[in-house]
C-alpha cells in the first residue's frame, strides 16, 4: 500500500492541475479573447508597415529578404487562423469555452512570437548606410558563393592590412572580377559609418583607356565640375586636392587592360594619404605587377556546386526535375564554372523540358572542345550555344551591335535603323512599326544576356567577352557575317590588305583616321555596312574608296571634318539605303542625290548646309529626313517637299529655316502648305515664321501626325516629359490667335515672351471646351495685365463651382518661369483647373509669388508628386490657409526648394507628408519645419546646408533620429542672385 501512495499522489496532482487549468481557461476566456484581439491588431499593423518597408530591403542580402517573406507568409496564416477562431467563439457554448480558451491561448503565443520577430525586422529596417560615402553599383552579388566569398575575404583582409596599399584582382574574361569588386563596394555601403573609408570611388576603365574619361568619373564623385577645354594636367591637380581632403579613400579601377600611371590621373600616392587604397581588376596578372600591386587575388571559376546553383537560378525549376536534372548538370559542367557562360547557357535553356533538346545541347558543347585552341575560345563555345538559339534575323542584329567600340552605349534607335537598312526588320508598314519590332528584338537579346542596359537611358551595350565572341564569329566566318571590326582602337590609317571581297560589314568608327586609301576598282563587292563615324581628323573621302563598296546599304560619316560629299553619279551606290552625315560641321553642300534610287534615310543633323538637299524629290522610297540643328539652312525651294510622297519623318528641330504660309514666304521658297500634302508623314518638327498658321483651321492634316514639334516665332526648346505632340509659341503677340483647334491634338504647350496672352486665354475659356490631350503647360517670361486677369477670374468664378470648366482635365506638368503672379490660385482659378491629375509643378523666378494657394482656396492636389520652386523672393508659404485638415499634397514624393529667402512655412505644425522620398532645401534660411515624422518610411534623401539642418525644429523628436542617415549636407555658398537681365521686365 505504501508503494502505491506516490503513484496515487502524482495522479491526483495531474488531475488537479488539469482541472484547475480548465477552470482557469474558462474563467479567463474573456481576457484571452481581449488579449488575442489586441495582439492581433498589433501584428496586423506591423505586417502592413513591413510591406511598405519591404522595398528598402531590395539592396540588402538575399537571406534577409527570404526571412522577411517567410515571416510575412506565417503572419498572414496566423492572422487568418486567429480571426477564424475569434468568429467561432461567438457561437461557442459555455461547456466548450475551456477548450476554445486553450486554443486561443495557443494562437496568442504564436501571435506574440511573430510580433517579436517582426519588431526585430523593424529594427533592421531602421539601420541604413550612409549613401554619400559609397554609391550603390547595380548588379548581382556573390556573397553566397563559396569560392567568391573566400576571394572577397582575401580582399577585405588586404583592405585592413598596412602592407597592401594596392590590390590586384585578376582572372580570365567573364569569370566575375567586376561582380566581385561590385559586391565589395555594395557591402561597404551596407556597413555605413562602420566601414573605414571616407569615400569609395568605383570607376570603369575599359580596354581603350581614356585618361580623360577616367578623370571625369573620379571628378564626378568628388563634385568637381569638368570643363571641355581643361587640360588633363589641370584636372589631375584638382582631383589630387579633392582626394587629399578625404580622410581615407578607396579607388576601385575596374577592367584595366594596360598599366595606368595614377600620378597622371591625380591620384595621391598611398604614402601621402595614409590608409587610402587602390583596387584594380584586370584580365592580366602582368598589368597588376606593372602597377606594383602589393596583393594579387586571382579570381577562379565557380566550384561545381555554386556553378550548379547559378545555373539553376537562370535555367529555372525545370532543371531540378528527375528527367532533366542529370543531363542539365552535365550541361552546367561543360560551362567550366565560368559565370558568364553559365548565365548565358542557363538563360538559353530556361524552361526547356524536352530531354532530346538537352541531349542535343550536351552533344554540341562536348564536341566543341577538341578544336578549341585557346582559353578565350573555351569561353566562346558556351556563348555560341546561346547565339545558335537565336533566329537568323536576331543573329544578324546581335552581330551588328559588335561593330561599336567596347563599353560603348549604343542608342537603340540608331542600331534599329541599321537593322532596318539591312533588311532585318519586316516591312510592317511605317518606320514606327519597324522601330517597335526592332525594340522587341533588343529586349529579346537582353533576355538572352547577349545585350545589357547601357549607361544612359534608351541605350544598350555588350559585355566585353560577349563582344569578343561576336567579333570572333564575324572574323572567322566566310559567310554573310564575315566582318572587319576595328572600332575604337586608335587606328590612324587603314591598309588595303585589311579589306577583302568577302567582307559584309566594315567598322572603323571612333578612330584617328586622317585619310583613306584611294582604291581603283570595286573591291569589297559584298560589303553592305561601312561605319566611319567619329573619325574627327578625317577631312576627305576619296571617290575611289567609296567606289570600292558598290553594294553599300549603310554609310556613316558622322562626326568627320569632310567639307563635301563625292558626286553620287560617279559613286554608283545604287543600293544605298541610309546615309548618315550627322555633325559633319564642315559640310556646307551636297551633290544631287537623285541617283541614290533606294535611299530611305538621310541624316544631316548638325551640318552647315545652306540649302535643301537636291534630288530627294526623285527618290520614290525616301522616308526619313533629319535636318535638326542645321543652323545655316536658308533655302528650301518651292514644290520640292510636296513631291516627297513617301516621307514619314521630317525633323528640323532647332533649324535656322522658318516655314511660312502661302503669301508670306519669299518668292520661290517652300510653304507650310506643302507639308500638308505629305500623306504618309507621321513625325514633324519645324519652326514657323509667325502666327497666321495658327489661324488657319484648315490645317487639319496635323491630326494625322503621331508626333510633332511646332515652334511658332523665335527658336525656343524646353524639354518636358510629354513632348510627343508639342506646340511652342515664342516672342509673338497672340491676342488675335485662336489655338483651340490645334490644342485638341497637342500634348504639350509652351508660351514664351508672348504679349496678349490674357486675350488668348479668355478666348479659350469662353469657348467652354476642355483639352483632354494636353498634359504639359509651360508659361515663361509673361507679364499679365492684372485688371484683365481679375476680370476673367471673376467671370469664371461667377458660375456654380460644379459648372466651372476644367480647361485642362488631364494636365500632369506645369512649368512657370518669370511670370508675375502673386498666387498660383490666380492661374488655377482663371483657367478653371481642378488639377486632379497634376503630378509636377516647377516654378522659378516668379518674383511676386507669395503663395501657391491662397486663403480662399482649400483645394488639394491629390496626385501631385513633385514640387520644385526656386528664386521666388516673395514666397512666404505654400498654402495661406492656416488650418486645413489634411495635407494639400497627400502623395508628394519630391520637394525641391531653392533660394527662397522669405519662405517661412510649407505646412501646418505637426503635419506629415507620408509619401515624401526626396527633399532638397537650399538657401531657405527661415524655413524651420518639415512635414516629416518617424513614420515617414519612404524617405531616401534629404539635401541642404548643415547649418539649416541643425536649426530645424521637430514636432516628433524621434523623427530626427529616423531621417538623420538620409541627410546629405551641401557646401554652404552665398545666395546666388539672378542676373538683372534674367528678371522680369
UniProtKB/Swiss-Prot annotation:
Biological processes per GO annotation: defense response
Keywords noted in UniProt: ATP-binding, Coiled coil, Leucine-rich repeat, Nucleotide-binding, Plant defense, Repeat
Recorded coiled-coil stretches: 24-88
KW Oxidoreductase (keyword) present: no
Molecular functions (GO terms): ADP binding; ATP binding
Keyword Cytoplasm attributed: no
Pfam families recorded: LRR_RPS2, NB-ARC, WH_DRP
Protein residues bound to ATP: 171-178
LRR repeats: 502-523, 526-547, 551-572, 575-597, 598-620, 621-643
Ranges where the NB-ARC domain occurs: 167-429
Entry's family note: Belongs to the disease resistance NB-LRR family.
Matches recorded under PANTHER family: NB-ARC DOMAIN-CONTAINING PROTEIN, NB-ARC DOMAIN-CONTAINING PROTEIN-RELATED
Record comment regarding domains: The LRR repeats probably act as specificity determinant of pathogen recognition.
Protein name: Disease resistance protein At4g27190
Organism field: Arabidopsis thaliana (Mouse-ear cress)
Taxonomic lineage from the root: Eukaryota, Viridiplantae, Streptophyta, Embryophyta, Tracheophyta
